[in-house]
């Protein structure tokens, strides 16, 4: 999988301790639509892309006694839906792990419904939808158990 980074123990993006995997690509729709340079992850745009074997990521996750979920985010996971599905296939089938997997997307649900359908067979998937819109008050999301930056953003278990 092509990634920009991994945080083995993340406590801010989901209610459970997570491995946070930074995806590699984004079209920066939040900036384009707001007309502002507002991307919370713009530093990642210049980070190098690295390729890491799915098995290495899964083993790293499973060997950590703290983490209880995996979160994909940082840039746009839906830009790598094929790679994420391949990862999930190994995670669920080969390693028999049913832990929560969360995807933070800037897309609205109706924009990625085909991609959502690809995720359903893997079970226990949560997707955070909605672009970052600057100058909004953060709100608590009950599904994720964390505050989201814009009031149009929400998570759904699919």
List the model feature ranges, each with a label.
Residues 26, 77, 132-133:
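Short glycine-rich anion-binding loops that position phosphate/pyrophosphate groups of nucleotides
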Residues 66-91, 138-140, 144, 157:
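Conserved glycine-rich "GG(E/T)P / GGGxP" loop and the immediately following alpha-helix
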Residues 22-24, 41, 89-92, 121-122, ...:
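Short, low-complexity, polar/charged sequence segments that are solvent-exposed and flexible
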Residues 19, 37, 55, 86-88, ...:
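Generic preference for flexible, low-structure residues
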Residues 44-59, 78-121:
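Canonical radical SAM enzyme core domain
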Residues 2, 6-15, 62-65, 95-158:
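Auxiliary Fe-S-binding modules of radical SAM enzymes
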Residues 11-52:
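Canonical Radical SAM [4Fe-4S] cluster-binding loop centered on the CxxxCxxC motif
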Residues 22, 69-74, 102-104:
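Short, conserved beta-strand edge motifs with alternating hydrophobic and charged residues
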């Amino acid at each position: 999988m092509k990634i920009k980074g991994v945080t083995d123990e993340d406590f801010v993006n989901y209610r459970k301790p997570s491995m946070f995997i930074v995806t590699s690509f984004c079209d920066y729709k939040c900036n384009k639509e707001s007309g502002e340079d507002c991307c919370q992850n713009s530093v990642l745009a210049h980070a190098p892309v690295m390729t890491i074997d799915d098995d290495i990521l899964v083993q790293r996750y499973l060997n950590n006694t703290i983490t209880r979920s995996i979160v994909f985010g940082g840039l746009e996971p839906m830009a790598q839906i094929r790679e994420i599905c391949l990862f999930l296939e190994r995670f669920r089938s080969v390693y028999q792990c049913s832990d929560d997997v969360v995807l933070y997307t800037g897309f609205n649900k109706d924009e990625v419904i085909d991609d959502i359908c690809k995720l359903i067979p893997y079970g226990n998937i949560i997707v955070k939808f909605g672009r970052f819109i600057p100058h909004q008050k953060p709100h608590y999301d009950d599904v994720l158990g964390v505050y989201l930056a814009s009031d149009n953003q929400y998570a759904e278990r699919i």
